[in-house]
């Protein structure tokens, strides 16, 4: 049995660990709420964009915008959204399984240090690495999107897909892969907006009649599609941030609970060791008294 001094040292260490994991759990919970609030705050913007795209789709034939051009896919472009830090449970590992399943030629743009390390370790083709802060500003995401869309327009990649952890609830984050480019049409973009954010785009004739597009609907559509692409990836980054903080909150809660259980076990072990020591001292005193009396 370990000495009481060793057990006390272990108890102190476990208490410190439990305190740290509890603090990290609370921080992750706060950040998760902020990411969810940011995603909800973007819904009015997404709803208006869906309505505008739906109206434009009715008024113009789909122009040969570079984002709409379908071509043979020889090289896939993948935007991989991961975390910068660890301690997020199996979140990143589940995303890496999706990457491992990709057998066709692909080039990667990675958001997050963990993803960049994985791509480098597995010797995949890394085009660029970006970091996005916890607050995930739109301008930060826009830089990522502009880089990847340029690769698509220049023919470096023939399609663009996004891999990210989709937030379902606090306990469930689903590793997801979705095509971003080329777009499958304006109507598909509208449906993607509605499905991705839960918004609706009511087709009100009165509202549509009030929409004037200058200089012309085709030009507006050409300007609106890049905004749509930026908004899609921005929403996916917010989704990934909520998933990251949720996974970390759950992981830290599990660690805290395990530390509490270990602390209970160590306290019991300490009490047993202390009791054994006291009993041994009593036996030795009694034996000494018996020997003296004899």
From Swiss-Prot:
Membrane topology: Peripheral membrane protein
Record has Cell membrane as a keyword: yes
CC per GO annotation: plasma membrane; proton-transporting ATP synthase complex
Entry keyword set: ATP synthesis, Cell membrane, CF(1), Hydrogen ion transport, Ion transport, Membrane, Transport
Record keyword Transport present: yes
GO biological process, one term: proton motive force-driven plasma membrane ATP synthesis
Intracellular or extracellular location(s): Cell membrane
GO MF term set: ATP binding; proton-transporting ATP synthase activity, rotational mechanism
Entry's family note: Belongs to the ATPase gamma chain family.
Oligomer status and interactors: F-type ATPases have 2 components, CF(1) - the catalytic core - and CF(0) - the membrane proton channel. CF(1) has five subunits: alpha(3), beta(3), gamma(1), delta(1), epsilon(1). CF(0) has three main subunits: a, b and c.
Protein purpose: Produces ATP from ADP in the presence of a proton gradient across the membrane. The gamma chain is believed to be important in regulating ATPase activity and the flow of protons through the CF(0) complex.
Protein name listed in UniProt: ATP synthase gamma chain
Gene: atpG
């Amino acid at each position: 049995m370990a000495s009481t001094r060793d057990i006390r040292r272990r108890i102190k260490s476990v208490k410190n660990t439990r305190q740290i994991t509890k603090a990290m759990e609370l921080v992750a919970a706060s950040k998760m709420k902020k990411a969810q609030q940011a995603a909800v705050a973007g819904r009015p913007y997404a709803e208006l964009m869906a309505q505008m795209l739906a109206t434009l789709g009715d008024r113009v034939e789909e122009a040969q915008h570079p984002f709409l051009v379908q071509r043979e896919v020889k090289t896939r472009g993948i935007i991989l959204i991961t975390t910068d830090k660890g301690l997020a449970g199996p979140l990143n590992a589940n995303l890496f399984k999706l990457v491992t399943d990709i057998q066709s030629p692909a080039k990667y743009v990675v958001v997050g240090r963990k993803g960049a390390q994985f791509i480098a370790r597995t010797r995949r083709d890394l085009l660029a690495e970006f970091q996005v802060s916890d607050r995930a500003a739109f301008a930060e995401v826009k830089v990522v999107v502009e880089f990847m869309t340029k690769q698509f327009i220049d023919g470096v990649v023939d399609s663009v897909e996004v891999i990210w952890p989709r937030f379902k609830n606090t306990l469930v984050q689903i590793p997801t892969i979705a095509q971003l480019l080329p777009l499958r049409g304006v109507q598909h973009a509208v449906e993607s907006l509605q499905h991705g954010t839960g918004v609706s785009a009511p087709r009100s004739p009165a509202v549509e009649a009030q929409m004037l597009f200058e200089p012309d609907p085709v030009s507006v559509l050409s300007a609106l599609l890049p905004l749509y692409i930026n908004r899609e990836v921005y929403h996916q980054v917010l989704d990934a941030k909520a998933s990251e903080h949720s996974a970390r909150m759950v992981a830290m809660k599990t660690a805290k609970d395990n530390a509490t259980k270990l602390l209970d076990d160590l306290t019991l072990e300490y009490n047993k060791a202390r009791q054994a020591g006291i009993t041994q001292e009593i036996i030795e005193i009694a034996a000494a008294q018996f020997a003296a009396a004899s």
